Design a protein with these regions (language model features):
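Non-catalytic interface/targeting segments
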Residues: 3-159, 167-168
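Active-site cofactor/substrate anionic-group-binding motifs, chiefly glycine-
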Residues: 163
């Protein structure tokens, strides 16, 4: 599986510090990041402890089926890949529509678009200027704190490229 199950799911908050590294590299002060991520990690931890986290791994063991997941390494790869593409293409991109076109030029994004899962602009329009692009939400276990966007904006970030964005994150 890609998403964590069993012990890996219970250890989810151990990979959240990756979010600190990413945000700090974007110019957000570490004390601000820690203040925002700590309550989010505690919330995730509480939610996980109420879950029957080992059911899939237990079922695989009972059925004598090999089972593993590879979540963070895959997400790290996606993060680095997209950062590299953005760095290469940013001088030629000016608008959100340009970023969308670059993403759709990646075979996996093109295939996703065929299955009704194309990149979506959730704030702004295709003609909105890009500014500084931040690749976030690709790794680090789960979405970060919804209040991080103000700090990213203060660090000069104008555009967020994220894998998942909850309604609460969109509202911010």
């Amino acid at each position: 599986t890609h998403h964590p199950e069993g012990k890996a799911l219970m250890d989810l908050t151990r990979v959240m510090p990756l979010q600190e590294t990413i945000m700090e590299a974007l110019g957000v002060p570490i004390n601000v990041i820690e203040k925002l991520l700590e309550p989010r990690a505690k919330k995730i931890d509480r939610a996980l402890h109420a879950d029957n986290f080992n059911r899939v791994a237990d079922a695989a063991r009972l059925l004598d089926i090999p089972f593993m997941n590879c979540h963070t390494p895959a997400d790290n790869h996606v993060h680095k890949f997209l950062e590299k593409i953005i760095k290469e293409k940013q001088p030629k991109m000016r608008y959100l529509k340009d970023l969308t076109e670059v993403l759709l030029g990646i075979p996996e994004f093109a295939e996703g678009a065929k299955m009704s899962s194309a990149p979506v602009i959730v704030s702004g329009s295709p003609k909105s200027k890009l500014g500084k692009i931040a690749v976030t939400g690709m790794t680090g276990g789960t979405s970060g704190n919804e209040d991080i966007y103000e700090s990213l904006s203060q660090a000069g970030v104008s555009t967020i490229l994220a894998m998942h964005m909850s309604e609460g994150h969109r509202e911010k």
